[in-house]
């Protein structure tokens, strides 16, 4: 909900659902043991809503990051239309990494925090 608010200025309501239950015209999150990779996910958009399934909570998290990055930058206060489709994604490697050369340059702590954030958010 917070990621959608950041991108659009709109805070969608959050509602808990029972296993197997979905809500129409909503973003539904779920777990799917059939997804092979622990961080893999399937993001499906239709006229009925958005479904993000991951094998684990991490997979759902990365699916949410993909949805967040799919929202146009100029979406603040505007209607958002996403094309219908399905994205199946999983990491190629079991690790994520970036390199920051702290040996030759001094970096303030705040910069390092901003540098590390994309590792978790995938963007």
What are these regions (language model features)?
Residues 91-123:
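Substrate-binding cleft of carbohydrate-active enzyme catalytic domains
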């Amino acid at each position: 909900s917070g990621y959608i608010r950041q991108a659009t200025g709109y805070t969608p309501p959050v509602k808990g659902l029972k296993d197997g239950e979905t809500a129409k015209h909503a973003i539904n999150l779920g777990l799917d043991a059939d997804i092979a990779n622990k961080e893999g996910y399937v993001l499906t958009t239709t006229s009925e809503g958005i479904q993000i399934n991951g094998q684990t909570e991490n997979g759902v998290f990365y699916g949410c990051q993909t949805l967040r990055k799919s929202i146009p930058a100029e979406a603040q206060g505007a209607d958002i239309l996403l094309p219908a489709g399905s994205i199946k994604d999983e990491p190629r490697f079991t690790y994520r990494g970036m390199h920051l050369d702290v040996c030759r340059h001094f970096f303030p702590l705040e910069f390092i925090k901003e540098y590390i954030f994309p590792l978790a958010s995938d963007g």
